[in-house]
Regions:
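Class I (Rossmann-like) S-adenosyl-L-methionine-dependent methyltransferase catalytic domain
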Residues: 2-44, 50-103, 117-132, 137-201
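Conserved acidic residues
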Residues: 106
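A conserved beta-strand element that flanks and buttresses the S-adenosyl-L-methionine
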Residues: 109
Length: 201
């Protein structure tokens, strides 16, 4: 796969301190979605990190592929899958070029990927999702919210920005306030988020 310039995401997994998002368990919002029976069928976790959300879906019977730019994260996700006896697949790949995977999936999950992209790459990312998600398929997307105070963390996203990004060929069914669980940053263990349910038209 052709490499593009990216932030050094692998560095987030090679230091002695876990990255804020690498909490060692699924995000509660995705655990709720799993409990509601929504993480089903052929499922892609775009930006899976060390795999906790993907492995949760696999444990509930989904046919899971997880991708991430960070080789160390993918290696850890594969180790977890093996240790837990789960058949999830994990690949080093670019979320901006998902069509190269040759997949068609029923469900996409995004836990903290959309908010890393600038304006130019947002449209590319949405097109990349459309390349793999079947018509009528669901995307469950969780991103940093403009309701988050302070300056730490990624770019804040407004709900209307999220809706605008998916205005062409998609139906945004809901955008609701939620929270990320995070490793402690400045004394806090949660960050304000939006959880969007988006269906491909």
């Amino acid at each position: 796969m052709t490499e593009r310039p990216h932030p050094p995401w692998d560095d987030s997994y090679t230091g002695g301190t876990p990255a804020p998002w690498d909490i060692g368990r699924p995000q509660p919002a995705f655990a709720r979605l799993a409990d509601e029976g929504r993480l089903t069928g052929r499922l892609l976790d775009a930006g899976c990190g060390t795999g906790e959300n993907a492995l949760l879906a696999a444990s509930r019977g989904a046919d899971v592929t997880g991708i991430d730019l960070a080789p160390t994260a993918i290696a850890r996700a594969r180790e977890k899958a093996s240790a837990r006896g789960l058949a999830a697949r994990f690949e080093v790949a670019d979320a901006l070029d998902l069509g190269r995977l040759g997949l068609t999936v029923d469900t996409v999950i995004d836990s903290g990927v959309f908010h890393v992209f600038g304006d130019g790459d947002r449209a590319r990312y949405v097109a990349s999702l459309a390349a793999v998600l079947r018509p009528g398929g669901a995307c469950y997307l969780m991103c940093f919210s403009d309701r988050q105070p302070g300056t730490f963390g990624p770019r804040r996203v407004r709900a209307d920005e999220l809706r605008a990004a998916f205005s062409d060929g998609w139906t945004v069914e809901s955008v609701t306030a939620d929270t990320f669980d995070i490793n402690p940053v400045n004394g806090t263990t949660q960050a304000q988020a939006w959880l969007a349910v988006i269906r491909r038209g």
